[in-house]
Amino acid sequence: MRQKTLDVLEFEKIKSFVADETISDLGREKVQEMAPASNFDTVEFQMNETDEISQIYNKHRLPSLSGLAKVSPLVHRASIGGVLNVAELNRIKRLVQVQNQFKTFYNQMLEEDEEVKYPILHDKMNHLPILTDLFKEINETCDAHDLFDHASYTLQSIRSKISRTNQRIRQNLDRIVKNQGNQKKLSDAIVTVRNDRNVIPVKAEYRQDFNGIVHDQSASGQTLYIEPNSVVEMNNQISRLRNDEAVERERILTELTGFVSAEADALLIAESVMGQIDFLIAKARYARTIKGTKPTFKEDRTIYLPNAFHPLLDKDTVVANTIEFIDDVETVIITGPNTGGKTVTLKTLGLIIVMAQSGLLIPTLDGSQLSIFENVYCDIGDEQSIEQSLSTFSSHMKNIVEILQDADQNSLILFDELGAGTDPSEGAALAMSILDYVRRLGSLVMATTHYPELKAYSYNREGVMNASVEFDVETLSPTYKLLMGVPGRSNAFDISKKLGLSLNIINKAKTMIGTDEQEINAMIESLEQNSKRVDQQRIELDRLVREAQQTHDALSKQYQQYQNYETSLMDEAKEKANQRVKSATKEADEILKELRNLRDHKGAEVKEHELIDKKKQLDDQYEVKSIKQHVQKKKYDTIHTGDEVKVLSYGQKGEVLELVGDEEAVVQMGIIKMKLPIEDLEKTKKKKEKPTKMVTRQNRQTIKTELDLRGYRYEEALNELDQYLDQAVLSNYEQVYIIHGKGTGALQKGVQQHLKKHKSVRQFRGGMPSEGGFGVTVAELK
């Protein structure tokens, strides 16, 4: 896109605002590189990229990118044998730290809401390298200022020697400065440092009293800084140790630089990705300041910008306008007062196109739609503040000639006051001829004009729409409101009347312009009112459609969650049913064992194969198929009482005990009796029964799965509870309900304490609202 267009539309100011939102030089470099793309896939990708980060930015607290800096020059120097210092190593460490923190934040965000997907950001996170070892090496070796003493054994030993030697020097010099005989000879009773040597400040006249080396003197020459001979050798030792320390520091830094060099490619990837993240977050921050929204890009020639406003104008006073090229409209001509905001409308459209194709969210309501243009051409100048002259006309015409040479069907052209600066009749004719030419090129065009001849231009040409900016005759000022589809009308009579011009003069003037023009003005006024009403209705309709779509999406999500929950409940119910059958099978094994003992010891006439056959009948009740895997049921004859059936929803076999009407049946599945829909039953072939000799066992009394203790005294209730639990265990109940009511809570407390101690109770809990709430305790039996 032409740089001249970007300059006229002030895109650099937009980039400046985005750059202000970045944290690092990496992000600012990305902003400076930002420019409108023209490839459809590229533009759409950039917009989706920004939208993803904006969604995250608006919903979450992002980790800080503070300290993120460019490291590629350091990595390059490390790769060619240079040695990095501590500060430079810390810049690399901070890059790794920032990328790790952001990746951790991203993973935690996904765990909180697994259904939300950010495919573009996810891909960036997958590209971030693992640099844990490098971070650990740097972090354990140095801080922001220097190498740690423990960076190596040698360094620790050297620094320890330096510390001990310094301490001896200090002690020696402290004795000298604290000696009473030396007090008057010293400028100050302190130990100081000159040329990296420990010295004392001696008055010049007492130089001969101190044997040592003079390292410096004061500006006045009255103080000499002397290193006493008693510490010279110790200071020499420190100098040697300092040299040893420097050598060891260089060795350690060289080693760390080697680690950096080994991860050079990974560090460059991390720098690139985190620079992009900084850039995208800056876009998101700027989007929030202008309440930016994501447009939908269309392959066809479409522009629809609901309530668009210029992002560089004051948000509190700027007027938002809906700009659109509807149906087959290719040219929009805006007429109206010179100060009515026509130029702002042109710049708003052009700048929004440039922003969108640069991957920036745009200042409109939701629902905007845009084509992607190869080029946006502008002929916009401040025609209102300079005198119209030949030179002005020539300047504009030169620009227009360049535009017409390059424009094509993939161009958007913005003409401000087309044909102005010359004779009105010639200017209007030129304007119409130029519009005809660009229409033949296939370009989309928006042009402003104050020539009345262009109002009629759209009526005898297809694909051309009039528009105007509204003027308030009450306040005698423009409202800056754009009216699409409505040509501008003259307000001279209304303004004159408002200013007090005689009605006789106004009426006489009206007779001079003819009835047709008066009717046209009246028609335009009516169109203005209708246009405003339709515009408001359109915006409201768009809002309702968006809300309906959001509701639809939310309900679809809830429905899917419900289906998953329902399937989970069914599988859980199947598992519980199988557990009950398994428990019954275990009990049957115990019974068979008792029967065998009876047979063996008392000679009961029961044959082994008969016992096994009965056991198998109970085993046949148990299936492990998932609810999701049940097959389509086979229909045999009509189901009758006594038939053996398979319950499809549970995957269990049972016997029909009773038919309830034509649609339901009572079925016994092992120890479970349930009322089920007949359509959920599949008739199975009944096995032939062999005559068997029966060993009878006394039936236990049938009890309910609930015990109502309301009205009982405390001791009576606990006795009743003990008896009930024993019977429930014998009946192989896995879960029972103890109804104690709410009352004062004493009985509830007593029941629960008793359940806690009872040997047959595995655990207990308070009742759910559907089970009776606090008035019920649910006990699970062993």
UniProtKB/Swiss-Prot annotation:
**For ATP, which residues are the binding ones?**
336-343
Kindly state which keywords UniProt assigns to this record, in alphabetical order.
Answer: ATP-binding, DNA-binding, Endonuclease, Hydrolase, Nuclease, Nucleotide-binding, RNA-binding, rRNA-binding
Q: List, alphabetically, the SUPFAM superfamilies matched.
A: DNA repair protein MutS, domain III, P-loop containing nucleoside triphosphate hydrolases, SMR domain-like
**Which InterPro entries does the entry link to?**
DNA_mismatch_repair_MutS_C, DNA_mismatch_repair_MutS_core, DNA_mismatch_repair_MutS_sf, MSSS, MutS, MutS2, P-loop_NTPase, Smr_dom
What general EC class does the enzyme of this chain belong to?
hydrolase
Q: Fetch the NCBIfam families from UniProt.
A: mutS2 (TIGR01069)
Briefly, what is this protein's role? Endonuclease that is involved in the suppression of homologous recombination and thus may have a key role in the control of bacterial genetic diversity. Acts as a ribosome collision sensor, splitting the ribosome into its 2 subunits. Detects stalled/collided 70S ribosomes which it binds and splits by an ATP-hydrolysis driven conformational change. Acts upstream of the ribosome quality control system (RQC), a ribosome-associated complex that mediates the extraction of incompletely synthesized nascent chains from stalled ribosomes and their subsequent degradation. Probably generates substrates for RQC.
GO terms of biological process kind: mismatch repair; negative regulation of DNA recombination; rescue of stalled ribosome
Gene Ontology MF annotations:
ATP binding; ATP hydrolysis activity; ATP-dependent DNA damage sensor activity; endonuclease activity; mismatched DNA binding; ribosomal large subunit binding; rRNA binding
Q: Gene3D superfamilies per the record?
A: 3.30.1370.110, P-loop containing nucleotide triphosphate hydrolases
Q: How does it assemble?
A: Homodimer. Binds to stalled ribosomes, contacting rRNA.
Q: Which family does it belong to?
A: Belongs to the DNA mismatch repair MutS family. MutS2 subfamily.
Cystine pairs: none
Instruction: Report the Pfam families cross-referenced here.
Output: MSSS, MutS_V, Smr
Enzyme Commission code: 3.1.-.-, 3.6.4.-
Looking at the record, the residues that make up the Smr domain are 707-782
Instruction: State what protein this is by name.
Output: Endonuclease MutS2
